[in-house]
Amino acid sequence: MTLFHRLDLIDPYTCTPLIVRETSIVEPSSLFLGFPSFIDEDIEDLFEFSSPNPLDLFETVTDLVKIKKSPSSCKYKVIRRRLEPEYPLKYLCDRVSDLESKFDRLVSPKSDRKYTLTKEIKGSGERKYKWEAEIQGPLERKYKLEAEIEGSGERKYRWTTEIKGGKKDEEGLKLAALKKEKAKAKAIAAAEAEKKKNKNKKKSYNWTTEVKSERENGEVSHTYIIKATTGGEKKKKHEEKEKKEKIETKSKKKEKTRVVVIEEEEEEDDESSEHGAIVLRKAFSRRNGAVRTKKGKNKEMPPEYAAVMIQRAFKAYLIRRSKSLRALRDLAIAKTKLKELRASFHNFSYRRLIARDGEERQKFSEKIIVLLLTVDAIEGVDVMVRGAKRSMVDELEAMLDVVDPQPQGKSLSMRRRTFDMPDSLIRKEIAEGVTQIVQMLETEEE
């Protein structure tokens, strides 16, 4: 039987990394206890740090975990991790994350972690690794690892640690200082180069303006002169004269003169009367001219203000038109009701019923009064609305006078017009209708 048995171990909190390749359990006998070591622990040291190794801060490469112990024999589990040359940084990241997870579970269960890993591999064997880790918690920490491996076997490592509230590593401070110095040196060199370029090319500009005005003709002339000079051995002068604006201003606008023709006549009386009329005309013309000069020129309205005024006027027009249209619509509805009342009023059978029955007469008069009040309540400024309203009110009042006449002792304010149809005609029509009915009954009996 062999002394080495292979099995896989799984961490209950974190899964095992891919770099862990083999494990073995050794059950030593009493013969091998005297020897110092019987296991070949050849581990590839990729980083080649001088002792003490900085990787010892995270965890030793080989761990001995005691499984079982008895007075007769001891059993130990030997975990052997072989680091492949292709994944050194991955192993380091896994070990750091393992330690951080265990530490965060004990200290601060709520902690945010961020990891960034970049890897560049070239065909000649050159490799570059960059690893950054940020931990947010009560103590914010930041780790950075940069590794460069060239094909010839040269290796470069940079390890920086930042802890807020604590101290930074000396290497990180030195690197930051060097970077700042390099940036300052570059900025100074760029500024000096720009100064040299500017010295070679210098430009100066002169701007002059001349304004001339002639009051006699009312013309104003503007001349602009631009002078540009460039530094160095060669200097050039450019003069440009442009007359851009010629504004003709008139001091006063001459008013149109009125010509008055005077006809001389022989008669003195006519001359005296015409002379007075001429004097009055001159006085009125002078007065109109003085008023115009006091008012001044007609100021042009800006487009925005003009647009606002137009909108206001149009809105007022729309409001007036909508009111008049609403009034006309109400009058049309009232006119349909008036046609119904008119048809029933001109029906002789219904008129005889009104004359006999007081309740029906009261109902008909109430209808007329309601329609009269509705027509009277309609308001409108338009001429059409007022004319239609007046004609309908007059007709309804006349119908009401016939159906329900008022007593003679009424006041002048409550006076209404009488209907044009006298009562005698109604009585004659009633008598004729009665005779016709009697004749019809007699013919049926025969």
UniProtKB/Swiss-Prot annotation:
Residues 230-252 are annotated as: Disordered. Keywords: Apoptosis, Calmodulin-binding, Chaperone, Endoplasmic reticulum, Phosphoprotein, Stress response. InterPro entries: BAG5/6/7/8. Residues 303-332 form the IQ domain. GO terms for molecular function: calmodulin binding. One of its GO terms (biological process) is cellular response to unfolded protein. It comes from the Eukaryota. IQ domain mediates interaction with calmodulin. Binds to the ATPase domain of HSP70/HSC70 chaperones. Interacts with HSP70-11/BIP2. This is BAG family molecular chaperone regulator 7. It comes from Arabidopsis thaliana (Mouse-ear cress).
